[in-house]
Every structure is written in C-alpha cells, then in structure tokens.
Amino acid sequence: MSQEVLEDLAKVRNIGIMAHIDAGKTTTTERILFYTGITHKIGEVHDGAAAMDWMAQEQERGITITSAATTCFWGGNQINIIDTPGHVDFTVEVERSLRVLDGAVAVFDGKEGVEPQSETVWRQADKYKVPRICFVNKMDKIGADFHFTVKTVVDRLGATPLVIQLPIGSESTFEGVIDLVEMRALTWRGDAKGDVKMGAEYAVEPIPEDLKQQADEFRQKLIETVAENDEALLEKFFSGEEITVAELKSAIRRLTVSGSLYPILCGSSFKNRGVQPMLDAVVDYLPSPLDVPPVNGVDADNPQERLADVSQPFSALAFKVAVHPFFGRLTYIRVYSGTLPAGSQIVNSTKSRKERFGKVFQMHSNKENPVPKMSAGHIYAVIGLKYTTTGDTLCDQDNPIILESMTFPDPVIEVAIEPKTKADQEKLSLAIQRLAEEDPTFKTEQNPETGQTVIKGMGELHLDILVDRMRREFNVEANVGTPQVAYRETIRRTVEKHEYTHKKQTGGAGQFARVIITLEPLEVTGEKTYDFVDTVTGGRIPKEYIPSVDAGIRDAMQVGVLAGYPTVGIKATLVDGAYHDVDSSEMAFRIAGSQAFKEASRRADPTLLEPIMSVEVRTPDEYMGDVIGDLNSRRGHIQSMQDSSGIKVIQARVPLSEMFGYIGDLRSKTSGRAVYSMTFDGYAEAPKSVTEEVVRKARGE
C-alpha cells in the first residue's frame, strides 16, 4: 500500500500546521494522527503526552519547539505533516518548515481570532507563497465566535476567506458542521471524551431546518466568490446552470493553490469534532508536489530548475538537523527531484563536500520507519551526513545545483554559562557543538578576558530551553548567569595619525614594529562594520606585514576599550610606520596594530550601542494608557497606534535591556489580556546613564 502511494505524487501532500501558541496546533496534529490510524491512544498536551512534542521540555511546557515531520495516510493519500512552533523565540523553526512545505493549515482560536503570532507566521508563509486552508478551532470554548474569526482574517491579515463550512451550535452545544460544498450536515453527537470511538464516527444528515436559510445564503456567497475568480464557472453561473460539486471543488482547489483565497473550516480538535472533514479538505484543496512551481538554482549565470519528477537528477534541501538518542545526527530533507537508494553517495553543493546517505526513514514523530530509497516530492530523515547543516543543498554529483537557502537573524540575548566540574566542561563543548548544528540562531563564544563561555539566542525562552536540553540530553551541570544584552561599541570622533611603537630588546631576538593609524567612524550596514585602508608609500612597512596590522586591529576590535564588547563602525587607515631588518616580524606588527587601535579608540570618544527591538503590543482599549505609559518608562518610542477590531495595536521601538521580564509585567497590567511580540530592529547609541552603568559593571565596580 505505502509503496504505490509514494510513487503517485498527485496523492501526496506536504503540509504544515501553523498557529499562535495555544490555538490548538499540536492537539489538532494529534487528532490527525489518531484518525489516520497511526497513534492508538490520543496524546493530550494537557497530560504532556502528545506524539509530536517529542522533546522532554516540549511535553512539560506544553508547547512545540522542534518541527517533527510525520507521515500518515488518509483515503489513499499520503500526508507528510511538519509541526511548527508558534512561539516567537522560535522563528527559525517556522522559517525552515515553511521553506519545504507545499501547503499549510492555519489554525485559529475561535474566540481570539487572528492573534499576533498567527499574523507573524502568516506573513512568513506569504514570503514563501505557501497556499493555506484555515481551521477555526476551539468552537466549543465559551465566547467562541466563528464569524468574528473570519472577519479578523480579513481585517488583520488582509486575506480573502472562503467560508466552506458553518458551525452547528456553539460553545458547549457545538456538535458539528454544515458542509457548504456538498450541502449536508456532519454531526458528532454524544461523543464528549469518555466514548471509546473518540469521534472517529460521525453522522451525515440533512441540514437542520433552523439553519437552512443561513446555509443557503452562505452557499450562494461561496458560489459567487468562486465564480468571480474562475472564468469557466462564471459563464455557467450567469446562464443559471447548476454547478456540480466536482466543478466547485476543482475551482476551489485552483484558487487555493494559486493563493487567491483561503477556504475556512471549523471544529474542535479537543472535543474530536470536525477533524476528518479538515483532512478531506487538505486532500481536496491543498497542492501536491506537482502543483507547485519547479525549484530554481540560485546561480544566476547558469539558471537551472528541477521538476518534481523521479526521472530528473536528484536534488534535495536539508531543512533541519536533530540529535537522535540512538542514531546521532538525523538530517531532515525535502527531496525536490529524482530518486536515490539509501546508502548512495551525493554531493553537498552548498559546501562542495561529498556526502553519503546512511539509512533513510520516513518519520512518525520520533519513531522511525526505514525505507529503501528516497524519491521526489517527499520528506525524509537520513543518518550518515557529516557536513550538512540547515539550508544546504544535496544533489547528484554529475548535475550540481544550489537551491535557495534560508535566512536566519542574528541572536540578541546572551547568558554566561559555567560548567560545575572539569568533566562537565568537556560535555558542555560537545553539547554546544551539537545544538549549534541543529539551530542556526544559536551562537556561542568564549569571552577572552573572563574565559567564560557565552551562549546567545533569540529570546529568554529560547535560551532557557537550550540550557535545559544541555542538562537533559548531555548531562551537563552548569551555572547559568542572568541574561545579558549583546551590546556593541563604536567611536564618534576621528583620531588622526596615532602612532604606536612596539619594541622589545631583552636578550635573544628583539621585536620591533611602528605603525601610524587614523581611525574614523563608519556607518554600519548589514554587510559592513569595518573597513581597513592601506596608504603606506615607499615601502616604509613591507607589504607582507600589512595584513598583520589589519589582523591586529581586528583582534583588538573583539574586545572594546569601553566595556569589553565587540567594536563596530570603524574605518582604520594605516598611514605610515617603520620596521627593522632583523627584529620586525608579522607577530610584532600584529601586536603594534592591536595596541595602536586600543590607544587610538580611547581617544576617539568611544560609545556604547544597544540592541533595539521592534515591539508590537495588542491590548484591549481600556488598558491602552497603562501599556503606553509602561513602554515610555522603558525608554520606548511609540511608532504607531492602530485600531483592530476591539483592540489597540501599538508599535514601538524599545531597547532590549528594558524588555527583560516584560511578559509578566504586561500580564499583570492588563489582567493577562494583552499579548506582545518582538523582533530585533537594529543598534542605536545608548544614553549616557546606561553606558556608565554598563561600564561600571564591566570594570567590576
């Protein structure tokens, strides 16, 4: 059974389930796995037993962090699901999942509608042009309102919703849905928890009389919306002919795949209602690998594309590296073209290294199902890849191609971490290396002065989880400092011709190097934070020593003169110097360059730069004054305020150092009703009081 499904790509769906935290994404995925017959007992997130949440912390915290890929079958079709996290600290996970999906199910909370995080993920999906269907979940919740949620899709996302289902009953009386395409009612009666069938069986009935009129109105709207966007149906519609269910379905499919509109369904995953029709919609309306455009290589001089076809040369993208308890490195890949047996040799074209596939699996959460080969259009987990990291292309040796990779933001928050014993030190290095392979937004460095290891990430929760994983998976016992902000230093003033002579004449070979440098402030851009110019004439410093001066300056820039933070925004010009035939060396000039920079930058009015975050707060009207007052007290600049269906959306730029612990303060000020999201915006000069405080701390005063 499984083999024949694998070959016919029209029956394959690679989908993601995307949502705000707590909209019920993992629960929805669990139900899908249950109804498609993979899991025998439904895992509840409340019990910490969901099959997709396979890291210990995910099960404890009830949130999903890593996108586990899972394969299941529904009505003769194969659905590969990638579970994505909705928490903003894990943008990298969402980005990488969207990059390899063909379609997605956006899950919304029926009471809250579109929330900030859903909006962030929705925009990321727009960037990768991923077709979506929407599932309005939690229809059993008090205050759930299907029509309000549909309205938020228009107001907040600016998308065109296509309502293809209506709820029957609401809150505690929610018992099923009206299918507007086939004009019938699907009901799940008396099946609240307790019943063994777990919602696996439902009744197909005529539409209840009291809802008939509403159903007819929405059916009419549905046909009008589809006909307006589809020429073939428009003619039938105007000539008054009956549009068949099959015609309507294929038109909805075309419009969904092209991203023109988004079908909307509803249900309650937790109460086991409405999940099977959503699976039918995944098959009916979301694209197969054959419906999406071919992938292109990034080499502009040699444009190439690969079709989702087994006869094409092999190409695949690695989108995640995970550490598996038994197999070690597990690389998740999406195969775009061609086919290869397990054990084949291929080339990693991004890094120009040869690689060999070991065993190949199709995954069910964290259980593996070995398969003999990989073929186009599918998602696999493979072992045996040594050099491949997230975003790398793997391809046939004779037909190289590099596929578009993914972009990852720089980390903005750091904590010092100290192993408790010598044995922990070794385990810590291994843990850091493994975790950095998995997560491109996790960076680490050694502070040269204190010798401490510093780990950096995208937010407080992100680092908490990484430290926790070191403890659990690698048994590292370590003391963790309080979160620190990743400051930078720069200069404000030009220093002309600063001279420094390095000489040492005590027994044995001496050392001699003289350099004269000019430092100027340089505007920092994404690509450029430092510029070195050599204007030495007449061989006053031999050519072979010039790069050493540059290297010395770079060394010194790693530890700023003000508070030991990396220096950026420097243009250094080597103006002149002197050397000695015997005593000069590359080392001597490196030391001279480094010392000259340190002295000159002290005179160049050094200053501190702090990371500024772009913060968005969504709050009910009545708390707006408090929220704005609080942001102002955190040195925030309010950029804009907008109304968005009963709530105010405040956009502000706030220094990261003022945002620690913000979530708790915001909850207490707004009785837990406001939510916020923040992303890194850029660096800006820190005020004097902040600079003095940071400098004092750095000097241990």
From Swiss-Prot:
PROSITE patterns: G_TR_1, G_TR_2
Principal localisation: cytoplasm
Localization terms from the record: Cytoplasm
Single GO biological process annotation from the record: ribosome disassembly
Chain ranges of the tr-type G domain: 10-290
Family, per entry: Belongs to the TRAFAC class translation factor GTPase superfamily. Classic translation factor GTPase family. EF-G/EF-2 subfamily.
An annotated Gene Ontology molecular function: GTPase activity
NCBIfam families attached to this UniProt entry: EF-G, PRK12740.1-5, small_GTP
The protein's name: Elongation factor G
Function: Catalyzes the GTP-dependent ribosomal translocation step during translation elongation. During this step, the ribosome changes from the pre-translocational (PRE) to the post-translocational (POST) state as the newly formed A-site-bound peptidyl-tRNA and P-site-bound deacylated tRNA move to the P and E sites, respectively. Catalyzes the coordinated movement of the two tRNA molecules, the mRNA and conformational changes in the ribosome.
UniProt keyword DNA damage, yes or no: no
Residues binding GTP: 19-26, 83-87, 137-140
Pfam families named in the record: EF-G_D2 (PF22042), EFG_C (PF00679), EFG_III (PF14492), EFG_IV (PF03764), GTP_EFTU (PF00009)
Keywords, alphabetical: Cytoplasm, Elongation factor, GTP-binding, Nucleotide-binding, Protein biosynthesis
One term under GO cellular component: cytoplasm
HAMAP family given in the database record: EF_G_EF_2_B
